[in-house]
Amino acid sequence: MGLSACGDESFTDSKVTPIVLMDMAGDAMIEVAVGATYNDPGCTATYMGKDYTDKIEVDGLDAVNTNAPGLYPIYYSCTTPEGHTYGAERVVAVCNPKVKYKAAGTFLTATGTKRVDANGVEQAYTKSFVNVTQLASGLVRVDDLLGGYYAAMKAANQPTDGAVTIQALLLMAADGTFKPYSVKANGKAVQLDAFSNATFNDKKGVFTWTVTYKGDTYNIVLNR
């Protein structure tokens, strides 16, 4: 339950300004398993001591897609006859609530990380940073599926053309395996050629995966 205001009046320049008290049922973040049905618990509003719920406008509810992992904001708002707007916000996390471990942290590429280009030429690289952010249970965001390859080449004074970082959401399973969603290269949605060997060892804090993008394959090993 969330309240967007702590009373029915505010005082400005010695004048009483009635406000809307928003009372959001349920939690500010609700986790829903992928494929499940989401039923919004809703929000009520009180204005000058009277029920004002029928004046609430809801934005974002229709955008919630439980088949696509991610975070979906829902906004509830009410406007008084005087034109003052009050609101409350909820986030629906489409994730895997069964996952109890956390996979967030700053990771370094480790031995075994390499790029194999379309011609079979291998290039190892280590000690580049990859950030993993925990969004919800079993749902994280990784800032570069390529393991910071282009940043590593730049640091080694071997800059290459077409530098790209690939961001993605990772939906984790209880056994540590995972799949990528909402994949973007430099902020634009893209398709990967392949993604495999994806595991996370919670006890050791080690990520591994193999990703192929535009014909080049990257074997990634990350240590936390």
Please give the residue ranges for each predicted region.
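Beta-strand secondary-structure signal
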Residues: 21, 42, 73-75, 206-210, ...
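Extracellular interdomain linker/stem segments of modular secreted and single-pass surface proteins
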Residues: 16-19, 94-102
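Ser/Thr/Gly/Pro-rich, low-complexity flexible regions
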Residues: 98-224
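Generic structural detector for well-ordered beta-strands
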Residues: 23, 31, 77, 91-95, ...
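Solvent-exposed, low-complexity, repeat-rich "mucin-like" stalks and linkers
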Residues: 18-50
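Bacterial Sec-dependent N-terminal signal peptides
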Residues: 1-28
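Serine/threonine-rich, repeat-prone extracellular segments and beta-strand-based repeat modules
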Residues: 49-88, 94-95
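A domain-level signal for the structural core that forms small-molecule/cofactor-binding pockets
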Residues: 7-10, 89-97
